[in-house]
């Protein structure tokens, strides 16, 4: 079941492929951000299609850093990234600072998790 979902994700967003059938780049990131990241991927793809760059788009690294998403991308031919894509990534990196990494609810910008998810650790 999970492999089928991963195949569908990779077919839709090839840059989520990390070379391992059972996992995608999405699986390496906090669960609470999955919807946010998929929304970002949808917007990125819409722009990539306009510029005929879907096959050239790569994510070099994606991670949680300082309570927010850090998304490092490039084009495989090293041509400049269209500003529209850079703007999309920046928008979602900022939004991620307000989304709980565990559940996806709103949270303070200076915390990794919302108060509900943080409660067991207090």
Task: Please state what every model-predicted region is.
Residues 100-103, 114-117:
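Short cysteine-rich clusters marking metal-coordination/redox-active sites
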Residues 107-109, 118-121:
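Cys/His-rich microdomains that often coordinate metals
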Residues 87-91:
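Short, intrinsically disordered linker segments that flank or connect zinc-binding domains
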Residues 1-86:
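Long, charged N-terminal interaction/targeting segments
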Residues 65, 110-111:
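Ser/Thr- and Asn-enriched, surface-exposed coil loops between beta-strands
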Residues 95-98, 108-109:
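Flanking scaffold residues of small Cys/His-coordinated metal-binding clusters
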């Amino acid at each position: 079941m999970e492999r089928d979902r991963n195949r569908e994700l990779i077919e839709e967003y090839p840059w989520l492929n990390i070379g391992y059938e059972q996992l995608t780049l999405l699986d390496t990131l906090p669960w609470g951000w999955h919807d946010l990241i998929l929304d970002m991927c949808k917007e990125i793809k819409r722009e990539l299609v306009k510029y005929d760059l879907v096959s050239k788009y790569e994510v070099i690294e994606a991670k949680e850093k300082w309570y927010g998403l850090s998304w490092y991308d490039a084009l495989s031919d090293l041509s400049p990234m269209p500003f529209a894509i850079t703007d999309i990534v920046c928008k979602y990196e900022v939004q991620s600072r307000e989304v709980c990494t565990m559940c996806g609810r709103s949270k303070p910008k200076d915390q990794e998790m919302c108060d509900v998810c943080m409660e067991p650790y207090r």
